[in-house]
């Protein structure tokens, strides 16, 4: 199961209802953070997400509302006795930011922090997923990120149940290619796996104007998370500041052929999101506006009967 939790959905200034930007992506065995604005670890506590389970942090750009939660996050990990390494990815300047963080306070860490400077292309390559990136169009260098599962066999649930398996951890093991014992019998993965299916794809724009690089990166994604700092009619202001309106974000979603669009990074000047949502849905109907602590499950879009 894959879940996306919106820890913070405000733009440059937080409000009573919206924290600075951060998004948690939960996949089996790992949690990724995309951006880490001020107050992120408190939002994680409210969402029931442990910082100790975060394996990777992906930073889109170095504006304060996207990075100022990192020092506290690292310190809390140290206080709690973390030993597992943490990987941080970001644009040029991310190394200097990390060095500054380590100098500005008292840190006693028993874990390694691996910092990776990213300019685009493949960021992480694992057996079952990859993370890619592309430069977007903001007032400073900004990276859009895309998480994508690699193709894997469909899990034949009904066949597994017929073999005596109950829904639970055994299903996950078999889907990952691990044999499972049921009574005195060992069930092999190939007994309950079908033909390969497309993996889930999730794309996050960071702060950006509508641009071809994000459209290309997000092509065919199950979910596009796109900034919507300004409402429709504010295109000139959005262009000046390197941001997008709700309608522009919807046009990106339509051009990329994504399945669902969720808008985030909302200006505090807008108290009601209905106007933003209406403008976006006129262009791309499958649109929602994120709220803090909102969680959505993301599944692969596959109409095959054995999926």
Curated annotation (Swiss-Prot):
Catalytic reaction list: Endonucleolytic cleavage of RNA, removing extra 3' nucleotides from tRNA precursor, generating 3' termini of tRNAs. A 3'-hydroxy group is left at the tRNA terminus and a 5'-phosphoryl group is left at the trailer molecule
Keyword Lyase tagged: no
GO terms of molecular function: 3'-tRNA processing endoribonuclease activity; zinc ion binding
Catalytic residues (positions): 65
UniProt KW keywords: Endonuclease, Hydrolase, Metal-binding, Nuclease, tRNA processing, Zinc
Domain of life of the organism encoding this protein: Archaea
Disulfide bridge map: none
Cofactor: Zn(2+)
Matches recorded under Gene3D superfamilies: Ribonuclease Z/Hydroxyacylglutathione hydrolase-like
Protein residues bound to Zn(2+) 1: 61, 63, 138, 207
Note describing how the cofactor binds: Binds 2 Zn(2+) ions.
Subunit structure: Homodimer.
Cited PANTHER family: ZINC PHOSPHODIESTERASE ELAC PROTEIN 1 (PTHR46018:SF2)
Sequence similarity: Belongs to the RNase Z family.
Function: Zinc phosphodiesterase, which displays some tRNA 3'-processing endonuclease activity. Probably involved in tRNA maturation, by removing a 3'-trailer from precursor tRNA.
Name listed for the protein in its UniProt record: Ribonuclease Z
Species this chain originates from: Methanothermobacter thermautotrophicus (strain ATCC 29096 / DSM 1053 / JCM 10044 / NBRC 100330 / Delta H) (Methanobacterium thermoautotrophicum)
Lineage summary: Archaea, Methanobacteriati, Methanobacteriota, Methanomada group, Methanobacteria
Underlying gene: rnz
């Amino acid at each position: 199961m894959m879940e996306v939790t919106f820890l913070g959905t405000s733009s440059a200034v937080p409000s009573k209802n919206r924290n600075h930007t951060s998004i948690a992506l939960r996949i089996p065995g790992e949690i990724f953070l995309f951006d880490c604005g001020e107050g992120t670890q408190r939002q994680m506590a409210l969402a029931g997400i442990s910082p100790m389970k975060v394996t990777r942090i992906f930073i889109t750009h170095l504006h304060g509302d996207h990075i100022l939660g990192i020092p506290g996050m690292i310190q809390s990990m140290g206080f709690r006795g973390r030993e597992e390494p943490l990987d941080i990815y970001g644009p040029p300047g991310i190394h200097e930011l990390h060095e500054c963080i380590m100098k500005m306070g008292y840190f006693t860490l028993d874990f390694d922090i691996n910092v990776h400077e990213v300019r685009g292309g493949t960021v992480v390559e694992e057996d079952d997923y990859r993370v890619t990136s592309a430069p977007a169009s903001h007032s400073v260098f900004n990276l859009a990120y895309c998480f994508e599962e690699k193709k894997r066999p469909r899990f034949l649930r009904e066949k597994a149940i017929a073999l005596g398996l109950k829904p639970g951890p055994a299903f996950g093991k078999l889907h990952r290619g691990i044999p499972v014992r049921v009574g005195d019998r060992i069930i092999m993965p190939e007994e309950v796996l079908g033909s390969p299916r497309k993996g889930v794809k999730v794309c996050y724009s960071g702060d950006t104007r509508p641009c071809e690089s994000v459209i290309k990166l997000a092509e065919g994604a199950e979910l596009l998370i796109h900034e919507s700092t300004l409402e429709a009619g504010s295109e000139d202001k959005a262009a000046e500041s390197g941001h997008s309106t709700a309608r522009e974000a919807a046009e990106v979603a339509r051009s990329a052929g994504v399945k669902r669009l969720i808008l985030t990074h909302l200006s505090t000047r807008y108290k009601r999101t209905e106007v933003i949502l209406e403008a976006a849905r006129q262009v791309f109907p499958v649109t929602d506006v994120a709220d803090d602590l909102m969680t959505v499950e993301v599944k692969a879009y596959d109409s095959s009967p054995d999926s």
